[in-house]
Amino acid sequence: MSKPIDLKTVKIFEPLKKKPSFENKIFNTLNSDLVYEVLSNNSNETVNLWFKLQQSWCNNAYSTFKDYDSYLILVYLVNQVFQKYSDRFQYLTFQEFYEKTELNIDKINLIEISKELNIPKETIRRKVNFLQDQNIIFRKGKSIFFNNAINRVQKPSNSKKMMANFLEKTSSILGKEDWFGRPFTKEEIEKFLDSYFTICWQHWLRLQIPFLVRHRTFFGDLETWNVWGAIGISQFTDYSKQVKGRVVEDPRTYADLYLHLLRHTPKNGINASSISEISTIPRATVIEIKYLLK
């Protein structure tokens, strides 16, 4: 069972400190449909930064254990810790979170993790034992904890910067709409991510984990997906160079851009060595993934 909240020391997320008022019914919210429409119609400007963010995060994920499934289970457990803070209306800064010597996970439910990640229960068991062997998690009494090894295996310093770059661009695009307000700089965004880290990264992992699970289910494993993604990034780079300077009549939606990429024939292909360099997956493994050619 979780420990009770110490009301003397609990740190409440700033927006929640504002006293509700029936007289003042101004809420700082955005219409998600409008946001999606604007960003979708400007996909040409954002997709490159999105690819860089995903590639950076995925490369770090693979490099940590040379095994995507172990890392996926790790971030799932980390997100449980984030969720626990959120449920208590608490948050930690980036520095505070990674300065902790241990973090309580409470318990690990193999069946629940297996269902959420679409990975067999016995595989989950082996990967959790691997994390324990690596001294990343440990048991104390009836509870399970992360120790401070989390600092070296799951500290998204570079991904945080990449995300700030991506959000700066989306902010710049949305800032042209009268309902959005002023755009934000990457420095402001990264400072916000640092200050409200466990809240922000919980939202990121709520997007990222299902995103990875979908691709793992479709491709069979995330290594194959990352190889496919490296080829896609190469094709997008070639496409961008060829269309640069063209007069484009209308903004392309993400769906339109995706179709253009599928129809595009690049001037130059990409070899196994380059795919390995982009994805950090060994060249021998890249060569073994042959069914993408079919």
Give residue spans per PLM region.
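A short alpha-helical element within helix-turn-helix/winged-helix DNA-binding domains
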Residues: 96-115, 262, 268-278
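Short, Lys/Arg-rich nucleic-acid/phosphate-binding segment
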Residues: 140-151
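N-terminal leader segment of winged-helix/HTH proteins
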Residues: 2-71, 176-229
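Short glycine/proline-centered loop/turn elements that form peptide/ligand docking sites
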Residues: 87-93, 99, 105-108, 125-126, ...
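A short, conserved structural fragment
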Residues: 132-142, 294
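Short amphipathic alpha-helical interaction segments
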Residues: 118-133, 280-292
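Short, amphipathic alpha-helical interaction segments positioned at domain boundaries
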Residues: 152-182
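Short helix-coil-helix linker/hinge
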Residues: 64-71, 80-95, 218-224, 234-257
